[in-house]
Amino acid sequence: DLISVKPSSNPIIDCVQSINFAAMTPMQVNTVLNQSPDKLNLIEQLIIGGAPVNSLLESKLQEVKTHCYSTYGMTESITHIAVKKLNGEYKSKYFEALPNITFQLNKDDCLVINTPHLSNSTITTNDVSKIINKESFKWIGRLNNIVNSGGIKLHPEELETKISDLFHNTRFFFSSLPDELLGERLVLVIESKNSISDLDSGLKKLLDTFEMPKTIFY
C-alpha cells in the first residue's frame, strides 16, 4: 500500500502504522527526531537525500531502530546512484554503487560516474572524492568549497567530520576569509553565544597543525 501525506517538515507526525520504506530530506529527519522521535521507529527502511547528512544528524541516527541510508545522486543521473548505510549493522563510511554503475576520478579528484544503462557518456561531478574501488567511494567535499590557505587545499566538509564529537547539539561550520599572506584563512563559525570549554585543546588533538582555524567566531 502507498501512504500519501501532505508535504511537511514532519511527514509522519500523524502516522500510527508501520512503514516498510520511506524517503525524507535531512531537514525532515531532524524535525521528526526533535518533535516525535518514537515515530521514526515506525519506519523499517529510510533513505535520506536531497542534501548531505551532517555528522550531528548521523550521530542521532545511531539511537534509532530504523535502517537509515544516505543517498547520492543528481539531476543528470535521474535518480540516486549510490547509497551509504548510516547506522546499525553494516554501517559504512563509503557510498556503494547501485547495480551497473561504476566510478572513477578526473584530474581534479572529482567523481566521474559511469551509467551505461542511462547514457553513453559519463557524468562528471564537482564532488571531490576518494575511490575505494570501482563500485564505492568516499565523499570528501565540493570542489568549489575548497579553502586554499597558503597553497594547502582544505576541505571544510572533511574537517567538520573530524571535529564533530566536540559539538553536542551545537551547529558549526568551517569557512574562509581573505588573507594577505595566505590568500585565504580558515575560520570556524560556531552557532552559540557561549564559548566551548577546552575547545582549543580538543581541536589540536583532532586536527593537523595546518588544519587549525585561524579565527573562531561565536
Model-found features: residue ranges?
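Alpha-helix/helix-capping structural signal
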Residues: 27, 51-52, 142
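Beta-strand->loop->alpha-helix junctions that form or flank phosphate-binding loops
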Residues: 69-76, 95-96, 175-178
